[in-house]
A protein has these predicted regions:
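One-carbon transfer enzymes
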Residues: 1-183
């Protein structure tokens, strides 16, 4: 698991572990509450700070993640480089608070509201070299209500996101270093 912030999605993933998946390590790009949540759950943690050499940071990140079958970017706010993506190709997934390919990037909820769409949602997708451009694994829609602002809509999307990521992880299978998900 990769985290950068509060770790609320991470906590949901930890709380819903069963025989289908286990969180074995949490790696962050800075000290953050997500690391504390993992430590409280008895999960191995590591912080890999981004220095001036981004290529070295990616190598250090690969070493920190180790032998994980699946890497989940759960609120991780850094772009993963070629070294990392090559090491975990086809096995790194991300959640996004919009129905991709619409509204990629860090402000998906705000952008959906500004555009005036009536429906947005949550997407789980594979991570590739682009920003939120990887192959879509699963999506779930959330209707935008007249009284929604960015915060209220984001909370409703997070609720759906938490269910969706657990569904995806429970359906995940790794075969020949490739992540297969049958939902």
């Amino acid at each position: 698991m990769l985290v950068s912030g509060t770790g609320s999605l991470l906590q949901n993933i930890i709380d819903n572990q069963d025989d289908s998946y286990r969180v074995i390590k949490v790696v962050a790009d800075k000290p953050c509450p997500g690391i504390n949540r993992a430590q409280d759950a008895g999960i191995d943690t590591e912080v890999v700070l981004l220095g001036s050499d981004r290529a070295q940071w990616n190598k250090d990140l690969v070493a920190a993640v180790g032998t994980a079958d699946v890497v989940v970017s759960a609120g991780f706010m850094k772009i993963l480089g070629p070294e990392f993506l090559a090491s975990f190709e086809g096995r790194t997934i991300n959640t996004h608070p919009a129905l991709l390919p619409s509204f990629p990037g860090a402000h998906g909820v705000r952008d959906a509201l500004a555009y005036g769409v009536k429906v947005t949602g949550s997407t789980v997708h594979f991570v590739d070299a682009g920003v939120d451009t990887g192959r879509i694994i699963a999506q779930r829609a959330v209707e935008i209500e007249a009284e929604d602002d960015e915060a209220s809509l984001h909370e409703r999307i997070k609720s759906v996101e938490r269910e969706l990521i657990v569904q995806v992880l429970r359906a995940a299978n790794v075969q020949d270093q490739q992540l297969i998900i049958e939902i």
